[in-house]
Regions:
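Hydrophobic alpha-helical bundle signature of multipass membrane enzymes
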Residues: 1-234
Length: 234
């Protein structure tokens, strides 16, 4: 952003916080439409249930569950079904989930959390210096940047050495990714739900920024880095 004046209702905290809230509500409405009116993708739990019934109730294999036969065969070829069956002591082909109540009742694609995360961090990357580098120390022996990551059991932090410094853009991307991937870990989404919904949220945020620019009296530009490595100037 080229304007160097102190902001309040335009480039200050109130407008940024307001836009983050606004883009979140628009993202939820947009992804809700995709869920119910376009894709209606079955949740992983639902797919797992169909696979379990296919394998445990043989008379369904040539009936109502025949369409999933190619999927079951592909999983057999990768020996995934054997691993799941062994893990469950032969009792079920279902995998454990993080939610005791099971998956949400609405369709899987796109992911609401990922869409909101993609939209909100895009707003933040637009208003802040996304290239700003975090002031990390350097290792004297190698000259690499010192950062930290959790140890194997999550009880503490261990030092890691980085070739490149951490930036605002990179850290915001991590936040969006962690929010989105967390839903995959929980067992309620697929990878494509995550990555494509981040991009959907990004496009919603860019649309709002383009729309909002006409309401500003200042002549300014914003360069927004994109998840695919490109950039968009507003």
């Amino acid at each position: 952003m080229e304007d160097k004046q102190q902001g309040f209702a335009t480039f200050g905290g109130p407008v940024i916080l307001t836009l983050v809230c606004e883009v979140a509500t628009r993202a939820l409405k947009a992804v809700r439409y995709q869920k119910f009116n376009v894709h209606r993708r079955l949740r992983p739990e639902g797919v797992g249930g169909l696979i379990d019934r296919y394998l445990t109730i043989p008379n369904l294999q040539d009936g109502e569950l025949k369409p999933i036969a190619p999927l079951v065969e592909a999983l057999r070829n990768e020996r995934l079904l054997d691993r799941v069956n062994q893990f469950n002591n032969g009792q079920s082909y279902l995998l454990p989930m993080a939610f005791p109540e099971g998956s949400p009742m609405h369709p899987s694609y796109g992911a609401g959390h990922a869409t909101v995360a993609g939209a909100c961090v895009t707003i933040l990357k637009a208003f802040f210096d996304h290239g700003w580098q975090l002031p990390l120390g350097k290792d004297e022996a190698t000259g690499r940047y010192i950062a930290y990551e959790p140890n194997a059991d999550g009880s503490g932090l261990v030092e890691v050495l980085l070739e490149q410094p951490l930036t605002v853009e990179g850290e915001l991307n991590k936040v969006a990714a962690n929010i989105s991937i967390g839903r995959n870990w929980a067992g309620v989404h697929y990878f494509t739900d995550y990555i494509e919904s981040l991009r959907l949220g990004e496009q919603i945020a860019i649309g709002i920024l383009e729309e909002q620019k006409f309401t500003f009296g200042e002549n300014f530009t914003m360069t927004v880095p994109l998840f695919d490595g490109g950039a968009r100037q507003i």
